[in-house]
Amino acid sequence: MKRIPYRISDYENLIRKNCYYVDKTMYLEKLEDLDNTLVFLRPRRFGKTLFTSMMSYYYDINSKDKFDELFKDTYVYDNPTCNKNNYYVLKFDFSGISYSGDAEKIERQFSEKIYNGICDFCGKYKFNFEIDENKESSMMLLSLLRQFKSLFLDNKIYLIIDEYDDFTNGILKNSELFKKYIK
């Protein structure tokens, strides 16, 4: 019997638990026809995390063996795009950053999220990259991209950033922080 999902934001988990799912995979085809940079502007609790999770499984080169199981009975199962399971997916999740305290604390938390995303990426694909967590987040990303490029792989990175709005809204709500970041 199908279950009603509650607080499930991981696509694979939702499918394995046999939960109801409103198929939104037909949008993948449409999104691929758009620009390379996509931003989803929807209110909180509107399914962005689940949608980006579904995108992650669809585009992830490591999910190729699970495609039939995860996407049967969906639009994209019968109409796959040429980008199906064709990327190394790098995902950042900025949820949970605390905006109380000073700017240095927030920047440290932001850098931790970047570092954790990079570590997850390297672990998932078994890349033995050296990333210095004490560097600025931009330098960590630059290091990752340089090392990735040096491998001369045929597949590219697909970047997914979740809860980017949580991070920016937190800064916008604090006028002192906002002033610091726009200088």
Identify the residue ranges that each predicted region occupies.
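Phosphate-binding site recognition
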Residues: M1-K183
